[in-house]
Design a protein with these regions (language model features):
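Polar/charged alpha-helical tracts
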Residues: 75, 79, 134, 138, ...
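Short catalytic/ligand-binding loop motif for oxyanion handling, primarily in non-cytosolic enzymes
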Residues: 123, 189-192, 255-256
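Positively charged n-region of N-terminal signal peptides that target proteins for export
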Residues: 1-4
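Substrate-binding cleft of extracellular glycoside hydrolase catalytic domains
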Residues: 29-178
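Functionally critical loop-and-helix segments that line ligand-binding/catalytic clefts
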Residues: 20-61, 205-206, 210-306
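C-terminal motif of bacterial Sec signal peptides marking the signal peptidase cleavage site
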Residues: 12-15
Length: 306
């Protein structure tokens, strides 16, 4: 899952809320490489459920004082209000080395576990789907799970043809009975394809819940499409789904030799640069719905574990 160019920010980002909140200047020392950690947010900040996604690149290096986590202990994520964790299973034919450890730790901490696979153009999508499903089935058999289901997601590169996305979806569904969630970048190539797709292709793609990526209200401006501005604006540009289901609003960018927060903060969506009192950047998402809706969604688009 790609990061975008980090925007300068001079203000301390306000806590997650569905309505505007005051933005205060940073306290003394806030711009130092190691800053003091903020207090943990409420479990369901802004009424939206918080989901963390991870890969072998995580955890990233600490940037301030606070709580850390590892692939073997994600209790700090749960303590700071996360409801679920989605780990990368593989990418373009290669399996992720930390996936199993992250999922075991997530289940032990009471987080809903999920997996995603980064689908790339240079490898046959059916072969990637087979690798994904085989890995998922192996994980499902690997332990006695507390969670009822393992969420399945496809992370589709921005240069993929829609036919490849459909082939991946079809193969995963044929082998598991589950339609994987569709993670799409803020990609002009994909937007042009979805807008021009025939009715049958659009209907099939709509069966996959939309997981969007938008880290800034200024991201995505180009010669074809303006910056979408909001998650709803990005939904409109794809001209396919009626709404988003998951939104990746926070990630990391590489700046001056370190990972720095890249977090959406505009209009009625105000998120802090760090997740609660964590000492480092994490990839952050929100689910559009209640805790009960999240549980139902996880089971509908997940492989049963018990």
């Amino acid at each position: 899952m790609k990061s975008l160019l980090l925007l300068p920010f001079l203000l301390l980002l306000a806590n997650c809320s569905t309505s505007p909140v005051p933005v205060l200047p940073p306290p003394p020392g806030e711009t130092e490489p190691l800053m003091e950690a903020a207090a943990p947010p409420p479990a369901y900040s802004g009424g939206m459920q918080q989901i963390i996604n991870v890969s072998a690149y995580d955890p990233k290096a600490p940037l301030r004082h606070g709580r850390g986590y590892s692939e073997n202990d994600v209790s700090a994520l749960r303590a700071n209000g996360a409801s679920g964790l989605i780990a990368r299973a593989g990418k373009g034919g290669n399996l992720d080395t930390k996936c199993a450890s992250f999922l075991t730790a997530a289940d032990r901490s009471g987080l809903l576990p999920g997996v995603y696979y980064r689908v790339q153009r240079h490898v046959d999508p059916v072969a990637q789907a087979d690798q994904f499903v085989s890995r998922v089935q192996s994980l499902a058999r690997s332990r006695s799970w507390q969670a009822p289901a393992l969420l399945l997601c496809g992370d589709y590169d921005g240069d993929l043809p829609l036919a490849s996305i459909l082939r991946f979806m079809d193969r995963v569904q044929s082998r598991t009975g589950v339609i994987p969630v569709a993670y799409l970048e803020n990609s002009p190539q994909l937007k042009l394809q979805t807008r021009a797709a025939d009715a049958a292709t659009k209907a099939r793609l709509r069966q996959a819940p939309y997981w969007l990526a938008l880290y800034s209200h200024e991201s995505g401006a180009g010669p074809i499409f303006p910056a979408p501005g909001t998650p709803e604006g990005l939904v409109d540009q794809y001209h396919l789904w009626s709404h988003w289901t998951l939104w990746q609003y926070g990630g990391a960018d590489w700046e001056r030799g370190a990972s720095r927060p890249k977090v959406y903060n505009a209009g009625r969506y105000r998120f802090r640069p760090f997740f609660g009192n964590l000492d480092r950047v994490v990839e952050r998402n929100v689910f559009r719905g209640s805790p009960a809706a999240l549980a139902a969604f996880w089971q509908q688009h997940g492989l049963r574990l018990r």
